[in-house]
């Protein structure tokens, strides 16, 4: 090829140089197989007619003969040179190549035809060009197969950015200047040469050929290389039909261009057939560091190779996103709003118009640069006239998403002068749906409910695990990055002393939020319209209620079980649990709000033998709110002990501690919340007598009970004989039990302070408060003596151990009888003691 360029045969030509058509060896083999080739005679006629029109209109337009197109359709198709597969459908052929032959070029050989320089690395070729061909821009690469070796031959075109075709023979007129040609994306950028030093061929060697404008020739060379990269063996005349409807901008030399090497030293082609890598790329083209580490372990390849493989695949598919777009796409994919769609090839019918398009149909700032997740749309055009050849196939962009589209498209411009009967038009793009602008995560303000959930979790652990993060995502609706950022900021603020998060302040915020939440309409999914789910049957509601009593936040296994048993969808179950949690919280807050200071004073003065208004209110709200109501019941000794132990440790339990207490005691969660509310109020008034005992003696035995507390509730085995007269005599004289006198009285009577106070009739307020607390003396009703009807509370001898066991048995019996019977047993104690005195 170099010897042909150095031919010294003189020839009178125009300033536009002749571009020779290089046909590789594969084309000759394809001709031998019977695939259609151009017909020179018909091409001559079309070329002559086109020259006449172009001389009048000062334009150059590509023309292909209809007979050639029909001959190609009848004879040829698309044949794979690596296997016997052949088809006439471009979509099927492209899918076959992508699936069956992902690796095409292995160890390419780069050859510079001007200098006979040979290398196996593209970097070496680039260095060679910078040293021996400085400032050269018109490089051309031709792919040749020689003895199972792929050769990329580099040559220099003498086009001077103007391309035209001159033919020998009489009647050939001079044509106007051609269309400027730019280099392919593979070539190095640089300034064009000022003078063309190449001499064209002899006139007798110039074969008559179709007139190809610059951009069409550019795409022919590029498509030739790309087709062979994908394992395609196409004909040169077939590639002549593909012309991008883009025009090079006038400032093309000022636009920065990046050369794309076909091979790098670190690229590992073995990853092209790795199913794990392909699936990961199809899910998201920008892997995180954690995903890279996982892929390194799964594929047994270095991380640097995986990074380069991902970058190459993104370049191959035309994906170029900014960091902001990557973050937004990752958030949308996490929220389930993006479905990863692989690039598809779609064939759409084109519209025909009789007008002449003088301006480019499609314009972009960079030639043939497609950004984002796009689909390739090939628009074949059928012509109704025998004098006009097949119109070029238009390359349009049908974007799946709008992440990568950097510049707007220019609409077609029509001129009033008709020139051709038919010409291809770009189909109008579908109207875009106006999407609301996405608010950055940092600009979104969190609601009070979201902050309350985050603070409650922050009190538990400043470094939440994945399970806690997913729970917060479900509860608050925030993204994972937002939750992580909030925790990071508050850890820093807590270390600096800027923010102090305590359980007391958190409880006040939760109460304020719950108070402001009354009267609102709740939706399980605030980002969408109110969900209209079908009504649930009683059996489904019962199954859901049973699961809710176990845990208000079901696990994944529990959700799968509920879906199987209830036949409901995951979304319906999540919605039901969300509404049920809100109903529970609002009911608890209503119970707490109803216990004001005014109502509490009225409830304290309630007479014996009657339920207080607080108990009536709690029972009524439980009946109306819960599907399976449970009235306020008397608490057993074990339940009271667990509640008191927790209260001594913290007066404001967390939701998790409430759930644990409900599971351990068997009480309703609302009843536990009410008990803590009452005891907090009593603690402020100083009427909680057992608080000091639980604070100073927290040691528990194997069963979870304080040894001293159990000892206090157990009667003494022995007591002095005169000890039985101390308590009635003390009550008879001062008629009132004082706290300071109690310390003197306890050593003389040889019993605990609690049993000593039980021997005396308590005030109405103390009786009511003790009953609301569920204190341990609820079960100490009067055990009447059948013979004398006189109750002795203090004097106990060794021989009365049977009576002690009977009295302890009556403890549990009295606890199960209810609040009304407890009041009657308390009232019976007064006349009995008075008779004894």
UniProtKB/Swiss-Prot annotation:
UniProt cross-link Glycyl lysine isopeptide (Lys-Gly) (interchain with G-Cter in SUMO2), position: 64, 455
Basic and acidic residues composition-biased segments: 192-203
Top-level taxon: Eukaryota
Keywords assigned by UniProt, alphabetized: Differentiation, DNA-binding, Homeobox, Isopeptide bond, Metal-binding, Neurogenesis, Nucleus, Phosphoprotein, Repeat, Repressor, Transcription, Transcription regulation, Ubl conjugation, Zinc, Zinc-finger
Region (Disordered): 1-41, 167-203, 404-445, 754-837
Bias (Low complexity): 167-180
Region (Required for nuclear localization) location: 317-446
GO biological process: cell differentiation; negative regulation of transcription by RNA polymerase II; nervous system development
Region: Required for interaction with NFYA, residue numbers: 263-497
GO molecular function, one term: DNA binding
InterPro entries the record matches: HD, Homeodomain-like_sf, ZHX_Znf_C2H2, Znf_C2H2_sf, Znf_C2H2_type
SUPFAM superfamilies associated with the record: beta-beta-alpha zinc fingers (SSF57667), Homeodomain-like (SSF46689)
Pfam families, sorted: Homeodomain (PF00046), zf_C2H2_ZHX (PF18387)
SMART domains: HOX, ZnF_C2H2
Modified positions (Phosphothreonine) in chain numbering: 37
Subunit structure: Homodimer (via homeobox domain 1). Heterodimer with ZHX1 (via homeobox domain 1). Heterodimer with ZHX3 (via homeobox domain 1). Heterodimerization with ZHX1 is not necessary for repressor activity. Interacts (via homeobox domain) with NFYA (via N-terminus). Interacts with EFNB1 intracellular domain peptide; the interaction enhances ZHX2 transcriptional repression activity.
Identification of the protein by name: Zinc fingers and homeoboxes protein 2
Species name: Pongo abelii
Lineage of producing organism: Eukaryota, Metazoa, Chordata, Craniata, Vertebrata
